[in-house]
Amino acid sequence: MKKIAVLAGDGIGPEVMEQALKVLVAVQKKFGFELSFQHADVGGAAIDSHGVALPESTLTLCAESDAILFGSVGGPKWEHLPPAEQPERAALLPLRKHFDLFCNYRPARVFKSLTAACPLRADIIGDGFDILCVRELTSGIYFGTPKGREGAGEDEYAYDTMGYKRSEVRRIAHMAFAAARQRSGKVTSVDKANVLTTMVLWREVVLEVAKEYPDVKLNHIYVDNATMQLVRDPHQFDVMLCGNMFGDIISDEAAMLTGSMGLLASASLNTENFGLFEPAGGSAPDIAGQGIANPIAEILSAAMMLRYSLGYGEAADAIEAAVEKTLDRGICTADIAVDRSQAVNTAEMGDAIVAAL
């Protein structure tokens, strides 16, 4: 039996989590494995119940589990707190640090039935596309030292440091190539090796790792060209391997091509494939409690959990196929519906996906 730490959190988190668990219960029955769901508070809910966004009991539960299924955290209720104590910073960042979740998988898929929601022209979209951004999360310019500000007046100077160890590049490259093996077998490494010394090392190490995956095709692209090519011809990409800052930008650009944050799943993993799986969107407090949130991102995050942390790839495929089948039938929540008067609510979308399984 696999043990799942369920951290529903705040806002729409509990609503979409309920639907994801409904789908997981159905898929475990279908495929004959067993999951144990253990719930704990996190984020604003934990501040209210325990006084901190990440209680020790929640952290202990996560450490004793095989994976973490996360909802969302944050909301206006806790915005008066110092930034370091607010749910977003005080819950997610410590979880990532504690479990060394250095690898971020961000899929961006345009389903054939939802191509109208994509901002690109129909001739560019075709029947849709499926891109996986693999982003290094714990190093690079966001974490580099020294950083600071010196001087005064017009001579004031601010600086940051970008740097990567060979080992850090190697481990994220392995994650990208391993993911590509489960997909179409193609990696595009995004760098700026023409001007940045850090990226020269990045490219060298990626080339070394590529030799261990002769069945995976490797291309290199400069980040400025990558941002253009994503909107010019997204079909050329499958797995995009990026450093922290470039991945931050590229993954958000790719995400917006899908047409809705309610479709975007995310996984953060360590070298043991232990991971935290969550929707890429936020807690959406403006619609929380109304039963209209799109649960697909949480459901697809659960599918990623099955694939990458638990080893149930066939079950993950079944969930993703059920989501696509449901959308093909024209069943949509308000955020992706062409005719909002025909939109289903959160629970109805969950029920439809279970039925499609």
Swiss-Prot record:
GO CC annotation terms, alphabetical: cytosol
MF annotations from Gene Ontology: 3-isopropylmalate dehydrogenase activity; magnesium ion binding; NAD binding
UniProt-annotated binding residues for substrate: R96, R106, R135, D224
Highest taxon listed in the record's lineage: Bacteria
Important for catalysis, annotated site positions: Y142, K192
Protein localization: Cytoplasm
EC number in record: 1.1.1.85
Keyword Metal-binding set for record: yes
Subunit structure of this chain's protein: Homodimer.
Cofactor dependency: Mg(2+); Mn(2+)
Primary localization: cytoplasm
Binding-site residues, NAD(+): 75-88, 282-294
Comment on bound cofactor: Binds 1 Mg(2+) or Mn(2+) ion per subunit.
Pathway noted in the entry: Amino-acid biosynthesis; L-leucine biosynthesis; L-leucine from 3-methyl-2-oxobutanoate: step 3/4
UniProt keyword annotations, A-Z: Amino-acid biosynthesis, Branched-chain amino acid biosynthesis, Cytoplasm, Leucine biosynthesis, Magnesium, Manganese, Metal-binding, NAD, Oxidoreductase
Provenance organism: Desulfotalea psychrophila (strain LSv54 / DSM 12343)
Record carries keyword Ribonucleoprotein: no
Enzyme class: oxidoreductase
Catalytic reactions on record: (2R,3S)-3-isopropylmalate + NAD(+) = 4-methyl-2-oxopentanoate + CO2 + NADH
Protein name, per record: 3-isopropylmalate dehydrogenase
Pfam families referenced in this protein's UniProt entry, alphabetically: Iso_dh (PF00180)
Binding site for Mg(2+): D224, D248, D252
GO BP terms in the entry: L-leucine biosynthetic process
Protein task: Catalyzes the oxidation of 3-carboxy-2-hydroxy-4-methylpentanoate (3-isopropylmalate) to 3-carboxy-4-methyl-2-oxopentanoate. The product decarboxylates to 4-methyl-2 oxopentanoate.
Record family assignment: Belongs to the isocitrate and isopropylmalate dehydrogenases family. LeuB type 1 subfamily.
Gene responsible for this protein: leuB
